[in-house]
Structure formats: C-alpha cells, structure tokens
Swiss-Prot record:
Enzymatic reactions: a (3R)-hydroxyacyl-[ACP] = a (2E)-enoyl-[ACP] + H2O; (3R)-hydroxydecanoyl-[ACP] = (2E)-decenoyl-[ACP] + H2O; (2E)-decenoyl-[ACP] = (3Z)-decenoyl-[ACP]
Principal subcellular localisation of the protein: cytoplasm
Active-site residues annotated for this sequence: H71
Record's subcellular location: Cytoplasm
Assembly, per entry: Homodimer.
A GO molecular-function descriptor: trans-2-decenoyl-acyl-carrier-protein isomerase activity
EC number(s) on file: 4.2.1.59, 5.3.3.14
Function per UniProt: Necessary for the introduction of cis unsaturation into fatty acids. Catalyzes the dehydration of (3R)-3-hydroxydecanoyl-ACP to E-(2)-decenoyl-ACP and then its isomerization to Z-(3)-decenoyl-ACP. Can catalyze the dehydratase reaction for beta-hydroxyacyl-ACPs with saturated chain lengths up to 16:0, being most active on intermediate chain length.
Protein name: 3-hydroxydecanoyl-[acyl-carrier-protein] dehydratase
Cross-referenced PANTHER family: 3-HYDROXYACYL-[ACYL-CARRIER-PROTEIN] DEHYDRATASE, 3-HYDROXYDECANOYL-[ACYL-CARRIER-PROTEIN] DEHYDRATASE
Organism, scientific name: Rhodopseudomonas palustris (strain BisB18)
InterPro entries attached to this UniProt entry: FabA, FabA_FabZ, HotDog_dom_sf
Amino acid sequence: MRDRRASYEYEDLLACGRGELFGPGNAQLPLPPMLMFDRIAEISETGGEHGKGLIRAELEVKPDLWFFGCHFKGDPVMPGCLGLDAMWQLVGFFLGWSGGIGPGRALGLGELKFSGQVQPNIKKVVYTIDIKRVMRSKLWLGIADGTLAADGEIFYRAKDLKVGLFKQTAAAQPAE
C-alpha cells in the first residue's frame, strides 16, 4: 500500500529513507546529512506549470548545517550540487509516490543556472518541482523543471531534470 498524502513531515521523509514509505526495494530518499529538505509541503498529480504534477519542499536553513563548516572555511555557502541533488531527490520521490517500482537514480538534466548562493543568513529554501512527463514502462522516467528559492528569491533554475526507477534484477539485489 502506497502512502499518498498531500504533504510529508520530516519523520515521514526519514521513513522513506529507511525504505518504509513505498515498500522495500522501491524509491527511497537519502538519509541525513544528504537529505536536503525538512518537509514536503505539497505534492499533487495535477498541479504545476504543465498540469502533470507539482512538489514543493522546504529546508529551514541554520548556520550549523554540516556543509557550511567545510564549504568554504570563512566563506560558507551551500554547494550548488546539493541543491541540484535535492531536486533529483524530489523527482524520485514523486515517481515512488505515483506508484513506480524500483530504486531511483538521477539520470541528468538539460540545463542549470545559478543566480545566487545559499549562505547561513538565509532562513528558508523552497524547492518547486514542476513535472513535465512521466513515462511508465520497465523503466519509470520522470522529467521535470525545478527551482530553488532562498527567502523568496529564485537562485537556481533547472530544466529537464531526469530521474529513473529501475526494477532490480536478482544480480542487483543487495547481498544478505
């Protein structure tokens, strides 16, 4: 049975990271510290710019977040790749939430533009993912556009984020 709520809190995201939300062997979020948002405030199959799905997630930015201490010493900034990874995480979550089977993997993107930096003085990051297409076959493939807004200002724009869910073969199953 899939969990199809319209929003998810932090404990739910951790359950997803443990493989408990969509079932064993299916889409999972990474666990902290690589989980890059605190909640999914909204998820739907019909919303968004293209009418094919919308996800809105939030991260409360705190000066003691793990990456500020090492990237960079004396000039703390969230690595851009982490914001991008959050967008891929959300597309994968959407595929699992939509009924897709198998573990997810980021497959690429068409274009990415940065116009700002997430620094410790930022209070909140909001990720918005607009689903453009979901292909359902042996491979479930999600294609989406995404933004990262910091305190209401868009800093990242990604086009054609691609994530796939792959049915595991016996050879790909983890050893017990």
